[in-house]
Design a protein with these regions (language model features):
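Residue(s) in the substrate-gating loop at a strand-loop-helix junction
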Residues: 142
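Conserved glycine-rich cofactor-binding loop
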Residues: 6, 13-15
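C-terminal substrate-recognition "lid" of short-chain dehydrogenase/reductases
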Residues: 134, 212-241, 246
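Conserved glycine-rich Rossmann-like NAD(P)H-binding loop of the short-chain dehydrogenase/reductase
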Residues: 27-43
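Alpha-helical segment proximal to the catalytic Tyr-Lys
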Residues: 127, 171-175, 232
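Active-site helix of classical SDR
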Residues: 122, 158
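Substrate-binding pocket helix/loop in short-chain dehydrogenase/reductase
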Residues: 98-99, 103-111, 193, 204
């Protein structure tokens, strides 16, 4: 489905991001994954190469909150491959600090990591995609962007921001053949969820109409669809991947 495509995936070393990288490789894309540390990038690359030595995958670890550093990396990728077809902004942090305990510095840190960093990757990519006649951008939002969360204001605020960025860019960039969408995962079996004791997991499952916790591959499948020609007329969509938790 993605044969010959060049994809950049931020936050691609573990969890949902790693699943997206793997899914894209399985479907013929060449992938450049971004991670926060060289150690985690190397570990992810080694794991992927062990699974299939033929996969064309490489990695980098620019600071996503440094606009120049990200732009330099994006431009280097473009020089090497001649294009960037797909950008997946998956990197981000969760947060549940209560409002009464959250100072402005902490609030700004979450916004910086979850919104500003997304913009930093999008801006240079858009310039290149416009020149090449199109492209696809996928942002990772969250189900809390639809209804907020009872504990912690910074994280849902940041994901509402991702939604606004996604929808506005879809309207702005459609004329250039650039599609912009987001996925909004629900409760997903990441490392954090997997570490929970069974007595805490069961109440979570009870809130999900489909009766199970999502897997990283569920989100990766949605990202595969959005990146493929099957979604050629889909843009500005915030695609819930949450087992009907929010509908």
């Amino acid at each position: 489905m993605l044969k010959g495509k060049i994809a950049v995936v931020t936050g691609g070393t573990r969890g949902i991001g790693y699943a997206i990288v793997k899914k894209y490789l399985e479907n013929g894309a060449k992938v450049i994954l971004f991670g926060s540390r060289q150690e985690t990038v190397d570990k992810a690359l080694a794991s992927l190469k062990e699974e299939n030595p033929e996969w064309e995958v490489s990695g980098a670890c620019p600071s996503l909150t440094d606009a120049k550093e990200v732009a330099d990396e994006i431009q280097a990728i473009h020089r090497k491959y001649g294009k960037i077809d797909i950008l997946v902004n998956n990197a981000g942090v969760s947060d549940s600090m209560m409002t009464i305990d959250c100072n402005l510095e902490h609030f700004q840190e979450i916004i910086n990591l979850n919104v500003n960093a997304v913009f930093n990757a999008i801006q240079p990519s858009v310039e290149l995609m416009k020149e090449q006649g199109g492209g696809c951008i996928i942002n990772t939002s969250s189900m809390v962007s639809k209804y907020g969360q009872p504990g912690g204001v910074a994280y849902p605020t940041s994901k509402f921001g991702v939604n606004g960025l996604t929808i506005s860019l879809a309207r702005e960039l459609g004329q250039y053949g650039i599609r912009v969408n987001a996925v909004a995962p629900g409760i997903t079996r990441t490392d954090m969820v997997a570490a929970l004791p069974e007595e805490e997991i069961q109440p979570l499952i009870a809130t999900i109409p489909l009766g199970r916790i999502g897997e990283p591959e569920d989100v990766a499948n949605a990202c595969l669809f959005l990146a493929s020609e099957l979604a050629s007329y889909v843009s500005g969509e915030i695609l819930a991947v949450d087992g009907a938790t929010i509908c």
